[in-house]
């Protein structure tokens, strides 16, 4: 049962100016919405060719970047200033290297609107949920990508984020780490009834883990198709999954003609 939209993007466009003063368009009239999760969270994805503006779109949603036109709404209110309501995790997640795991999470709470500030029980619960129990005193720069990614997820959850944006997180990971991170994200989405939006150029990944998929065209990026996934039929070897992947590939071929996927 839907309870209204958590995220709405209305006619968002973005232009940049080149070094010679030339103006070029990255995004063109983006429109999409994600409903409020009821139980079990919601996992949506944006699939696009490489260099199509999906990272720019994620930054606009999180209010790190300003749109040239249009607006982003969170629960019906314009969202244009980062406050922890929307948290963006880039392809290479970053934390404060001079802070240990627990300090990084505590700082995320301090700068957010989360009413549960200084709630050590909540912090310990989140540390456990992301698999970092016993590593509270460790520093992020000492560890692997997977470790730093877990810190970023913990910071987002501790800040009370209503939406977590994850930008192409699996591109450079080997299969074992990738599967581990995917399972972690899915578990956290369910446990915390969390809305997660991630971007990728990998059709297979998106179809296997998403409830909803948005197709973003080659630059200037436009959302030209929205696909709902029937989760009851989601099995890696199923004919249904194969047919959805085939449909997406054909849609891109017909729309862009030059799909530059990874």
Feature map (PLM): residue ranges:
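Q-loop/switch helix immediately C-terminal to the Walker
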Residues: 92, 99-111
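Conserved ABC transporter NBD signature motif
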Residues: 70-82
